[in-house]
């Protein structure tokens, strides 16, 4: 299984993130994982790295329509219900220490 994990390479730019995912989907990847970091990780620059909930709704649909698994890597388990409502295939819990 090949999993492509998308960390901060999008720098909060949703158009770039969409383009990035589209290029990944043109390969033989089996799954894509997005890392979700919390505000205390970024200190003052956090807001510039956030992708919107609407972006995640749309990108999950795009990935699932491509028959690729979608995962979310996060340390704030309070965010799981939102992503679970999008029918995420798997979760990866990050260490928040």
Each predicted region: which residue ranges?
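Catalytic beta/alpha-barrel core
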Residues: 48-51, 68-80, 89-97
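A generic structural signal for well-ordered alpha-helical segments
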Residues: 62-67
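Glycine-rich anion/phosphate-binding loops
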Residues: 9-23
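Hydrophobic faces of well-ordered beta-strands that scaffold small-molecule active sites
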Residues: 2-6, 30-34, 70-73, 89-93
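Generic structural signal for well-ordered alpha-helices
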Residues: 21-25, 53-60, 80
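Glycine-rich, proline-tolerant flexible connector loops at the mouths of alpha/beta enzymes
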Residues: 30-54
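Conserved, mostly hydrophobic/aromatic
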Residues: 5, 24, 83
């Amino acid at each position: 299984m090949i999993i492509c994990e998308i960390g901060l390479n999008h720098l909060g730019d949703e158009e770039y993130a969409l383009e990035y995912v589209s290029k990944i989907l043109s390969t033989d990847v089996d799954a894509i994982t997005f890392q979700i970091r919390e505000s205390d990780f970024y200190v003052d620059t956090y807001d510039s790295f956030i992708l919107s909930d609407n972006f995640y709704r749309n990108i999950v649909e795009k990935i699932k329509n491509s028959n690729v698994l979608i995962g979310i890597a996060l340390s704030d388990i309070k965010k799981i219900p939102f992503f679970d409502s999008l029918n995420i295939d798997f979760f990866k819990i990050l260490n928040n220490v």
